[in-house]
Amino acid sequence: MGILVVIEQPEQPDLLVVHASGSDPDVPGDPLPVTACGIDTASMAVDPWRPSGPGSRWYPPQYAGHVCPRCERAVRSA
């Protein structure tokens, strides 16, 4: 199961938060129902970016300042 980048789409774009979600095993490319930090993914957008390989970041560099710290910890500890 891969990690998908899912983006909370708030009313204010400067409050963007990037979360990690596992990939749904039944529908590849769709996120699981909740993020790694436990937030519902139903209203989130899936970013098409994928890590280049083992050891690379799970999120695109342009989102580095917007990563959910709880998702980051969950991905690193997995």
Language-model region placement:
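Short, intrinsically disordered terminal segments enriched in charged and Pro/Gly residues
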Residues: 1-29
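Polar low-complexity intrinsically disordered regions enriched in Ser/Thr and small residues
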Residues: 5, 25, 32, 41, ...
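A generic alpha-helix propensity feature with a strong bias for hydrophobic helices
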Residues: 13-16, 31, 36, 63-64, ...
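A short, structured beta-strand/loop element
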Residues: 19-50
